[in-house]
Amino acid sequence: MDMIRKSVISLGLVLLATPVIFGQDLSRYRKFALGSSLAVISKQVGQDGRQATLISESPALVQEITYWQMDASDGTSRSEPISHITFDFFNGALYRIVVVYDQKSIEGLTEDDMVKAISARYGIGVRLYPEIDFPSHDVYAAPEKVIARWDDSENSVTFFHSTGLESFGLSVFSKRLSAQAEAAIIESAKFAKEQAPQKEIDRQIKEVDDQDIARQKNIKSFRP
């Protein structure tokens, strides 16, 4: 009987602990939520959404805005340990948030220190040995290594090291929308490559036409 009672108590403790371990929301980073519109995020960070960087226009619209954390005006250390945050949008919906931490704000912290702090927000993650490459649509970007990862069925959070920036970062993304966005970016790049020869021909023809128009105009008005 005591054994049964202990088993029931243990099971109850596990069930109570489950929401704490697995109930974290992987669709958010602080006040920013995946799926939010470009207009909403632009307003939250005080930017004009019309100035978003165009990554791909076809077969789907992929855009990006970057928010830079400013130092305190009084010269004191910044209140947030963030260098900048990049927001990526697929057809107007936020599908990825990439946070890069300020070097001075995390000076002295080990990878394990940061994984522990992130786990307090997102629950138990998976430490990766060896580290794996962090995907990026920028082919010229320096390599980034994923150190740890937190997953649910729809979203993922990754803690990575940025070689180019010599700092660490956090990425929060929708698995479904990220896959669609990356496919669209690849297709757009492929189409642009296929169209490049014809675009160069069109450019050269236009250049010749423009020069001829300028010649005809100037030959009438030229007085030596």
Task: Give residue ranges: language-model regions.
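Non-cytosolic coordination micro-motifs
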Residues: 24-61, 101-224
